[in-house]
């Protein structure tokens, strides 16, 4: 677990009122959700869970029906992931979880940052697979991008 906290003007504790956890169905993202739920419970904070569909893969651009099916498939998967997170939250006594799946022409990183900024989120809790070296360079890192550009504190969970 890594915490990247934004500096405050004084030494007072920053209140966490809104927490965002982006998920992609991986075990890393579900682990991040577990941490986010515990923090939300301890801080009595609102919890937002999102899944971003960045773009349609090249092979799906051949027909409108294929594109529609692609989005339906992703939405079904996301709802399944949200269900898991919702169950974890209920088990911790958090009755309400705000969830959203959306497609965006921007990168996943930009979409997460924009979502967090527009909702004045205080903490982003995001899973990281812990890639290093060439794999990280070639594949990029959503978590790293979020850390670099977030307006708020970020908790990385492995």
For the regions a language model picked out, list residue spans one by one:
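Small/aliphatic-rich secondary-structure junction motif
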Residues: 10-66, 91-92
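Structural beta-alpha unit
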Residues: 1-14, 87-124
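Aromatic/hydrophobic pocket-lining residues that form π-stacking "cages" and hydrophobic walls in ligand
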Residues: 36, 85, 112, 146
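General small-molecule cofactor/ligand-binding pocket signal
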Residues: 50, 98-102, 155
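Gly/Ser-rich helix-loop-strand patches that form or flank binding pockets
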Residues: 1-9, 38, 117-158
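A short acidic, glycine-rich active-site loop
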Residues: 67-80
């Amino acid at each position: 677990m890594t915490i990247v906290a934004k500096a405050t003007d004084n030494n007072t504790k920053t209140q966490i009122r809104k927490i965002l956890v982006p998920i992609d169905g991986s075990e890393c993202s579900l682990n991040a959700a577990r941490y986010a739920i515990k923090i939300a419970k301890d801080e009595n904070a609102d919890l937002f869970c999102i899944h971003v569909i960045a773009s349609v893969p090249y092979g799906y651009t051949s027909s409108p029906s294929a594109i529609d099916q692609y989005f339906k498939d992703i939405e079904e998967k996301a709802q399944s992931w949200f269900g898991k997170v919702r169950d974890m939250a209920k088990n911790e006594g958090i009755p309400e979880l705000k969830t959203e799946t959306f497609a965006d022409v921007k990168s996943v990183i930009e979409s997460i940052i924009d979502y967090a900024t527009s909702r004045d989120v205080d903490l982003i809790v995001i899973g990281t697979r812990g890639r290093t070296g060439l794999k990280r360079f070639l594949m990029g890192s959503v978590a790293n991008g979020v850390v670099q550009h977030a307006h708020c504190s970020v908790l990385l969970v492995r």
